[in-house]
Amino acid sequence: MTQTNSYQVGGDHYALKTVQPWDAMEAWMGEEAFAGYLHGNCIKYLARYMDKNGIEDLMKCQHYLAKLIEVESKKEAMAESILQFQAGREAAICGLTRDTRRSKDWLEGYDQVKAEDDRHDD
């Protein structure tokens, strides 16, 4: 359970569910659309707090913002993991290339020595 799923502002009608609606939305909507949904709710609650529910709306805005930060942090962590994987793969390829080059150099040297030995045997 993520930190933002461990509580709810303004009741517990979502927190009591096995799957919270925003988790289902995240799974179905895709990253960009879900981030937009969270961003939109931040704007909604911030815009209406003076006219409707005051502090509670500010707390809801804060809750949606915390969820948006979780989502964006997860994206950044995933991007960093991908970069690390790619860097590791590139290093491995460079290592294989270097080892292949060494093997090729060794074989060429061996072939030269063998050719000289063969000439001396004639």
Locations of regions flagged by a protein language model:
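Intrinsically disordered, low-complexity regulatory regions
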Residues: 1-122
